[in-house]
Swiss-Prot record:
Transmembrane segments: 44-64, 104-124, 140-160, 183-203, 210-230, 244-264
Stored PANTHER family: INNER MEMBRANE PROTEIN YHJD, UPF0761 MEMBRANE PROTEIN YIHY
Entry keyword set: Cell inner membrane, Cell membrane, Membrane, Transmembrane, Transmembrane helix
Organism phylogeny: Bacteria, Pseudomonadati, Pseudomonadota, Gammaproteobacteria, Enterobacterales
Main localization (coarse): membrane
Name of the protein in its database record: UPF0761 membrane protein YihY
Cellular component GO terms held in the UniProt record: plasma membrane
Family: Belongs to the UPF0761 family.
Amino acid sequence: MLKTIQDKARHRTRPLWAWLKLLWQRIDEDNMTTLAGNLAYVSLLSLVPLVAVVFALFAAFPMFSDVSIQLRHFIFANFLPATGDVIQRYIEQFVANSNKMTAVGACGLIVTALLLMYSIDSALNTIWRSKRARPKIYSFAVYWMILTLGPLLAGASLAISSYLLPLRWASDLNTVIDNVLRIFPLLLSWISFWLLYSIVPTIRVPNRDAIVGAFVAALLFEAGKKGFALYITMFPSYQLIYGVLAVIPILFVWVYWTWCIVLLGAEITVTLGEYRKLKQAAEQEEDDEP
């Protein structure tokens, strides 16, 4: 009886182990950690230009003047754990200095921000091993759409949240709103990763695979924020070694860890489809055998 149960358990877990082995093989072949390091470097180079472009967009729309402040706090609180306040002060100071630049300098900021979009595009298509290239004009249009519409959609969602919060006319509705707002960062991360894995690759990505990969990445991202903040609080080795400059290596490590999570979600999305194809091919061979 015990042997039968063990055989059934082994039979059921065999596909999972096969999928995990395939996932690890793809991570190793794609040099995922190296890609994450490259993206982290470009992200740090593009951080101030990207924030400057985003805040300039909000300044162009007076209706988002109040929301832009909330969006700043939301970004730094949810995407830069533990040291968000310090980094926010420095970045806002850098952005204020960038406002004094000439038109040529402003164009340079936009190009640097678009460089990050190109690097993300290149890294994800490397993971999907796509050989097909988009037309340059189309790629530029996609990058510009993400750069402009992304912050505006985030601002609109925060504006809706700000409108819903004061509603106290229904206790049941108030409970629902509180629960939705509590999981809002997770939902936003999930949707963002799903769009990233669905739109950026130049080949068709099955929607269910993108949803699963994005959900895993969102969970890891939210857990990573809490774990990273806890680590910085409980083990302040960076503060002891670097002192007031500790914010720099902390930011480096967090950006690198974030890109590892993003690329891991992409690897999971790809592996789900590849494993399904391999399984179907194996079943087809078994059916063809006499």
